[in-house]
């Protein structure tokens, strides 16, 4: 019974760490590259500004 409680507390702790780390960007340059959509190519940015879809 005590082992199950420990396992449950450990599981909750790991899940909270994953949620917290998932909200922050790994580095700010990646965040700048990804601007409004998830495309990493440079030539894609002007194309996306001219077409009606993201």
From Swiss-Prot:
Name the InterPro entries on file: ELA
The UniProt record lists the keyword Signal: yes
Any one cellular-component term (Gene Ontology)? extracellular region
Specify the domain of life of the species encoding this protein.
Eukaryota
Q: What are the protein's UniProt keywords?
A: Angiogenesis, Developmental protein, Differentiation, Gastrulation, Glycoprotein, Hormone, Secreted, Signal
Tissues where this protein is expressed: Expressed in the intima of blood vessels. Expressed in endothelial cells in blood vessels in the heart and lung. Expressed in cytotrophoblasts and syncytiotrophoblasts of first-trimester placental tissue and term placentas (at protein level). Not detected in smooth muscle cells or cardiomyocytes (at protein level). Expressed in kidney. Expressed in blood vessels. Expressed in embryonic (ESCs) and induced (iPSCs) pluripotent stem cells. Most highly expressed in undifferentiated embryonic stem cell and is rapidly down-regulated during differentiation.
Q: Which GO terms describe its molecular function?
A: apelin receptor binding; hormone activity
Q: Does the keyword Secreted apply?
A: yes
Q: What is this protein called?
A: Apelin receptor early endogenous ligand
Organism the protein comes from: Homo sapiens (Human)
């Amino acid at each position: 019974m005590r082992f199950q409680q420990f396992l449950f507390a450990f599981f909750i702790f790991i899940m909270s760490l994953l949620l917290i780390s998932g909200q922050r960007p790994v580095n700010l340059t990646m965040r700048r590259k990804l601007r409004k959509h998830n495309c990493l190519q440079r030539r894609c940015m002007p194309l996306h500004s001219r077409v009606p879809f993201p």
